[in-house]
């Protein structure tokens, strides 16, 4: 028994969960390097496509994280993305200004987030019902106002980051992308720091986990929730803008 306890103590300092993640990462890296050695151009193309197709999923997930951490269940992310994609597309058709189209998409997501927050916080509507309302509303609006035969003025282009884009394998994947892809990568890092290493993040998590306790120590629960849902809406709007400004470059009903 004593020897067993000593052995357990000997290895107790090792974070086995981290070890498993590192081993899995090394295995994946080994597979990638193997295929890269055989067909480097094809491997880079596949990894680049994988990253770009993941962008709306990343941004949608971040939207959900910001809402959930504040105690709001947001199942209206798809509706926020849909309406943002539509208005970004129409702005691009009417003006040809890609930056304005991107801002319109983000603003649309923010407004839809504010609407969800109003339903859930002010009116105390069931959050699942509120998200369903947004999804149905977005589907109805885009289906009614959509017109066929419209053409956009182009898509967002790749921005290579100098010498970094020439690094074998990872250069074309990470450092030669359109702007929204870069923004999505940076937002993942920024969100991690914001939620777990700032006072605002601590308050957000407190509001989501125990709102009464947070209110007792003077945290404005409603304000935190409003801001988080709006910020999440901006990210959903960015995801929608990606679909029509950087991804497929067009819009279809639904």
Where are the model-predicted features located?
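Single transmembrane alpha-helix segments in multi-pass membrane proteins
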Residues: 45-95, 102, 111-128
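Short loop segments and helix-boundary regions at transmembrane helix junctions
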Residues: 10-15, 69-73, 112-167, 197-199
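Inter-helical junctions in multi-pass inner-membrane proteins, predominant
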Residues: 38-49, 147, 195, 232-254
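Small-residue faces within membrane-embedded alpha-helices
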Residues: 50, 54-61, 82, 105, ...
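Hydrophobic core segments of alpha-helical transmembrane domains in multi-pass membrane transport
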Residues: 20-34, 60, 139-143, 183-192, ...
